[in-house]
């Protein structure tokens, strides 16, 4: 059964390649510096193809590999992938466990390619809430790619916008309480320094793979 599903998956990709051939790449001045992708709709895509949801998630991993290679080739500075949100914990536990197994497998299997292609892996979100084995592989990959100077591939894991706002607010308040920052000095840069994405370039392009708005 699994082999039939894998064959069907390969056939779908063969019919619809992820990236068209670019006759003339965009000039560097027009290339987005920071691209973010909300990775949703994988399960629905699989259902539309007559496959089970987990095959949709596997297809998503294949897409990540292609997108990462592409962004590296056209010299995008940062690629953020919103891979697992705080809302995703509400999914069936069997599906959640599969997603983390898939993430762990990705971190292990893609490590050599990330290193070879000068890609630096980073991560944002409440990472301590992830399974211990996933945290370990994530940290190992981050450590091994830390000195790479090419594409910054940032995985948003256990991420929620409200969590980020709360975390940033607490960080600013702690600086005020310790005397490192006065209330009058609270401005946009001070808040940006406390965001999960501190140090990353401003977002230029946001893509939601499910097509929702």
Predicted regions and their residues:
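Flexible, compositionally biased loop and terminal segments
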Residues: 1-213
């Amino acid at each position: 059964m699994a082999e039939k599903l894998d064959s069907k998956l390969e056939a779908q990709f063969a019919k619809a390649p992820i990236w068209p051939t670019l006759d003339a790449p965009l000039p560097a001045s027009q290339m987005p510096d920071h691209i973010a992708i909300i990775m949703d709709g994988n399960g629905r895509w699989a259902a539309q193809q007559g496959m089970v949801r987990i095959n949709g998630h596997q297809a998503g991993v294949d897409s990540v590999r292609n997108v990462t290679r592409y962004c590296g080739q056209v010299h995008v500075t940062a690629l953020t992938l919103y891979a697992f949100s705080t809302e995703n914990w509400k999914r069936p536990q069997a599906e959640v466990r599969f997603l983390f197994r898939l993430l762990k497998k990705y971190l292990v299997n893609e490590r050599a390619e990330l290193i070879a292609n000068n890609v630096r892996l980073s991560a944002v979100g409440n990472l301590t809430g992830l399974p211990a084995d996933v945290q370990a592989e994530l940290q190992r990959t981050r450590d091994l790619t830390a000195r790479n100077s090419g594409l910054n591939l940032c995985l948003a894991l256990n991420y929620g916008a409200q969590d980020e706002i709360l975390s940033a607010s607490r960080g600013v308040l702690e600086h005020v309480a310790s005397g490192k920052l006065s209330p009058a000095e609270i401005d946009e840069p001070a808040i940006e320094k406390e965001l999960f994405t501190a140090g990353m370039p401003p977002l230029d392009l946001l893509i939601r793979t499910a097509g929702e708005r």
